[in-house]
Amino acid sequence: MMSTPVCLKQVHKEKTCSKVKTCLMLDLGRKEYEQSLVVQNLVAEWRKKKRIPDCLIFVEYPHLITLGRSGSIQHLLADRSMLEKHGVGFFLANRGGDITYHGPGQFIAYPVMDLKEWQPDVGRYLRSLEHCIINTLADFGVLADSIPELTGVWVGDKKIASIGIRTSQWVTSHGLALNVSPDLSYFDFIVPCGLRSKGMTSMMEILGAVVDTSEIKRRFCVHFSQIFERDLAPWRAVSIDWQTSGCFA
């Protein structure tokens, strides 16, 4: 599948980012995976060049499966025809982690951060993302935790949020996916995160009701701001022209 070209106008120019603890929020809405990836890559390049402060990207995907750099294709349990029958895309992802599913009903956040201006420690960054999710879930009465030696957030022995990141020159991309109210049957196409003994769950399965994703986003932003010591501000002056060709390949 070919990605739609993207124009993303850079309008936030900082004289210096080293003393600024601003983090811009960019909500892409529902987009194809390739479209989101183009935006992530462009924002990450701007961050490396210190043209913008940190950025927190939100997106929702149609049904798709991504396989990370450390993943095994054997953890994909469906063939191409089965995926096509159910309208599920498949992509190799330039991130850490194994295989995972994305789709409607997930809260997805991709922080693009320069860890040199926070803490140059990838392990601490991962644990901090987990705590953002754990604290957010606690706000809704869901008691979750991390598991030593495993990445992600868990309720008992079931995973409720997956994390897979990439770092380049200490700038992060990709991020986290929290299961709010997805159709969990789509996880049957894979061995989630390569862990055959673990299952998946969602906030809806635990609470028995649908939670407003906008409220989850609001609470997550509160905890993200506190844990990473960033002032979140909307990136209003961004123009994304999904139809104009030749803007960025």
Regions found by a protein language model. Give the residues of each.
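A short secondary-structure junction signal
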Residues: 70, 120, 164-166, 188-190
